[in-house]
Amino acid sequence: MTGFDCWIMPTFRLASVLNFKIQEIKIMKYIIVGAVAGGASAAARLRRLDEHAEIIIFEKGEYISYANCGLPYYIGDVIKDRDKLFVQTAASFQQRFNIDVQIMTEVIAINPIAKTITAIKSPTGETYEEAYDKLILSPGAEPVRPPLPGVDIEGIFTLRSVRDTDLIKGYLNRKSARRAVVVGAGFIGLEMAENFHHLGLQVSIVEMGGQVLAPVDFPIASIVQQHIRSKGVALYLNAAVASFAKSGEAITVSLNNGKQLTADIVILSIGVRPDTRLALQAGLKTGEARGIWVNEYLQTSNPDIYAVGDAIEFKNPITGISMMTYLAGPANKQGRSCANNIVLGNVQKYNGSINTAIVKVFDLTLATAGTASKHLKAANIDHVVSTTHNGSHAAYYPNAQQMTMQIAFSPIDGRLLNAQAVGYDGVDKRIDVLSTFIKQGKTVYDLAEFEQAYAPSYSSAKDPVNMAGFVAENILMERLKIFYWNETGNIKAHDLFIDVRRKDEYDAGNIERAINLPVDEIRSRLHAIPKDTNIFIYCEAGLRGYLAQRILRQHGFDNVFNLSGGYKTWKACTDESVLIARAG
């Protein structure tokens, strides 16, 4: 008798004695609606957790699991090979994961009592029902196409799917397009503007708001706007499209300010809305933001139906306000968590998204995490904002590039609430660090202690993340009093306004009413500075202003304020404000 026999036989005898019977395991049937980000992620995870389940995924389009974030770059010929856009095909997904993939098949109804769905096949129109044990909704969002006069003219497109991409690409190949108008200056709008520019088109951007990229604050957006203009792209802010009209082979785009633009192709990139039609038909609860309501386990108001992706809403972990999150990263992670909860029994809580996002705008990179200052104000959340300008790596090592970073934090405990960064190099790795700090509820004191990998070609001994923490720490410890670019007009005639840069810098450009007193001369001229008035100081980026402030404060000058972000921030913001005002 082998050792194995010695071990196994008593086990079977014990089972026999106890009259043990192996119970038949119920084979579960999972149905998923939507096969792009969240849906495909959920399907693959379900299979990894449950090899024996029956899994059916429905996709009304022709393609599944594609890289929708890469679509603008395929249009712009940055991505040459169309096949690179597809993470999986229906056939490869089905073969690898043993999942029944039903493409060109739209789920049109849910019967939550009978636990069935009704689907319709294209192009035959055949309808049929499928039963389910658990259902996952991942219907995504639909692009907004406003009911404007002429909006259905040939050559006006939205971009959301591979089909949209093929239509745009085909149109460009058929037409000799020279001029493009992009309506909307969000992430997709700016990416499309860049890619049209890459194709050699003359590009105009029309944006109803007063800045590009609504998730960030104006001081950061102003840097992006200047960069866009430097590329020869026309930018029309505070402008809305009133109508479209055909003018021969061209399209006339009429704005509400009376201006008219001529285009050969128009992209509408003015936002998306959650696709909640199925959820509403099934009687599922929707929320304050009009998305599908889910609990912390991504479970809808029906316990057998879960939902993920662009169609759901969830409370923002910073503001507590229900919101939509139209980002691929959270959607994919939700799909995985949802599958865990279905198979393992609600074991993984979803904590919401802080909307960490990044976008390439020509040579520039902008990234954000958390809740912007303007949205914190709208939510009545008290906070302080500070801005720093630093190099992407050590200044003495070649090719260091400027990076501007703005953070928002609690004045009570220093908890980090938002981070925004813009620059040419290293923005991505800094925002990932800052996003982690925000997500974990860390403070600006933690930023000051952040330990990064350092070599002069990669960073500085005091990384830009550290510098942001140092400045915020000084503000909280009341070693640094600040004022902002849009408050310079509030400085009174009897206040003292000092530019502490060198004379040549001052002569090259300064803020009206400021006198020049270089920081290195302050100690020798203390006798000439009155102590009974407010003193407002600025330098190029903020550091020399801080040094001047510390000198004055320790010589008995109490009311000394330093301009956050310095002349760089003031200049970018005021220049853009003037351009916007003139255009309006």
PLM regions and their residue ranges:
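Glycine-rich dinucleotide-binding loop and its adjacent helix/turn
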Residues: 137-199, 234, 288, 294-296, ...
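Mid-to-C-terminal Rossmann-like scaffold of FAD/NAD(P)H-dependent oxidoreductases
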Residues: 26-28, 35, 39, 48, ...
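FAD-site-proximal beta/loop scaffold in flavoenzymes
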Residues: 152-176, 248, 252-254, 259-340, ...
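Glycine-rich Rossmann-fold phosphate-binding loop(s) that bind the pyrophosphate
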Residues: 34-37, 160, 185-186, 541
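A Rossmann-like FAD-binding core segment of flavoenzymes
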Residues: 52, 96, 102-123, 130, ...
